[in-house]
């Protein structure tokens, strides 16, 4: 029951809240990737090397994660101790951000992430393991204590077809294995299926 100024403005039956939506039964499939693609030819001259370098630096596995990271509130109400972005223009991403949830206290909270879209496209399990390993490395790089880590997953799986659900299952397996290997719990997450 939600009340405002002594008046009931919302009343949601708990049975409906917890059991009102029928559960869907979805089935996923997964098959191992056919393996690595062919290696590219060695660039024949300086111009071809420059082009290859430009393409590598633009690749999502290498390029700046700034467009992704700018989408969430990394400053958290002005309690930032170590900003996620640095450099003269404030656009160079760092390994992680550190916030002080209680001003004046000698401790903080580290916020880090990891991502490898190419590896995840071959196998969501190893993409998930890589993402967790990168996030953990980024956390430690700014002084985070690996024994005090709480993990958070964010899954966005917009197409609930069998192949996508199989990949989702592999990603969840990776989360479970990372949790078991590190001894660190998943404390929260957001999972979106269409």
Predicted regions and their residues:
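Glycine/proline-enriched, intrinsically flexible loops and inter-domain linkers
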Residues: 1-194
């Amino acid at each position: 029951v939600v009340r405002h100024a002594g008046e009931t403005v919302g009343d949601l039956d708990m049975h409906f809240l917890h059991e009102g939506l029928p559960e869907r039964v979805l089935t996923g499939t997964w098959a191992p990737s056919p393996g690595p693609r062919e290696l590219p030819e060695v660039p024949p001259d300086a111009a071809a090397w420059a082009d290859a370098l430009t393409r590598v630096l633009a690749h999502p596995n290498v390029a700046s994660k700034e467009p992704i990271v700018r989408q969430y509130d990394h400053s958290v109400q002005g309690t930032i101790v170590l900003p996620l972005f640095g450099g003269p223009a404030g656009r160079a991403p760092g390994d992680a951000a550190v916030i002080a949830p209680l001003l004046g206290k000698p401790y903080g909270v580290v916020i880090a992430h990891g991502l490898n879209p190419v590896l995840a496209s071959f196998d969501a399990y190893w993409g998930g393991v890589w993402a967790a390993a990168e996030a953990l490395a980024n956390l430690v790089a700014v002084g985070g204590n690996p024994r005090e880590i709480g993990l958070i997953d964010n899954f966005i799986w917009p197409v609930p077809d069998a192949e996508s659900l199989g990949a989702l299952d592999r990603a969840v397996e990776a989360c479970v294995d990372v949790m078991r290997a590190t001894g660190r719990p998943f404390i929260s997450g957001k999972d979106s299926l269409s």
